[in-house]
Amino acid sequence: MMMRPVSSSGGGSGVGSSEYCMDSRASCLAEDERLSPSHFDLCPTKFFQSASAARPRQTCFSYLPPPAPGLLKVASCRQEPLLPQGPASAPGTNKSSDSKKKAASGRSGKRGRPTGTTKLAGYRTSTGRPLGTTKAAGFKTSPGRPLGTTKAAGYKVSPGRPPGSIKGQPRLSKVAYSSCSAAAFPYSIINKPAATTTAENTLKEEQSTESPKMLLQAPPFLLSGFPKTPPPLALVSAEVFSQSSSCPDGGPARALTLPVHSALPSYS
């Protein structure tokens, strides 16, 4: 379908030379009682908002004074921290966030409990006791006692001494000799043959001097009655006694040695 321009000079209907008619229709647009495009130019603000109608709205605050320059500066200063500082500050923030992520990846609790160790499995948050050693199994938090050594078995909680050791042993081990090989006291002072002989001689002299004093202190009547030499012993043979008299049962006779004094001293 083609459109052709229609040249008509009808002024009553207000149709100009810019009107068009269809080829299939014999009548024009003006003849069908339709408004021409020029009619819309008479009242453009009725159906469409023109640019001239929007201008008074923008200039409705034109009577107000302009704002002070100091207020604009304060507003701009306040808005500066909100804006990004630049590409140089981005790597620093990324590094801090990466370090926080790495530190948080190894921890699952508040006190630094390793990952995978839950409270339900028997793990505690105390750092002194190794993992897997619970209080119910007899393990304590004392660092000195080895694992598996309970108090009921006789082990103590001493941190410096292993179980079963002597208390004085570490003290003796601390005593160390000097680097020199010589003894602490010279041998000549400890063992002197001359000193020992003189000490023995003095003891013998004291004993010899004390013995006559004891003899002189004894009463004379006791010393005069006893003989100075012991009396001889007389041995009686077994032949003197007959077997029948000594052993009536017919058993073997035994020889007995009886000491007989030849002369008894007079006590008068």
UniProtKB/Swiss-Prot annotation:
Pfam families (alphabetical): DUF5568
Source organism of this protein record: Danio rerio
Family membership: Belongs to the UPF0461 family.
PANTHER family in alphabetical order: UPF0461 PROTEIN C5ORF24 (PTHR31894:SF0)
InterPro entries according to UniProt: DUF5568
Listed name of the protein: UPF0461 protein C5orf24 homolog
Top-level taxon in the UniProt lineage: Eukaryota
Basic residues compositional bias, start-end: 102-113
Chain positions covered by the region annotation Disordered: 1-20, 81-171
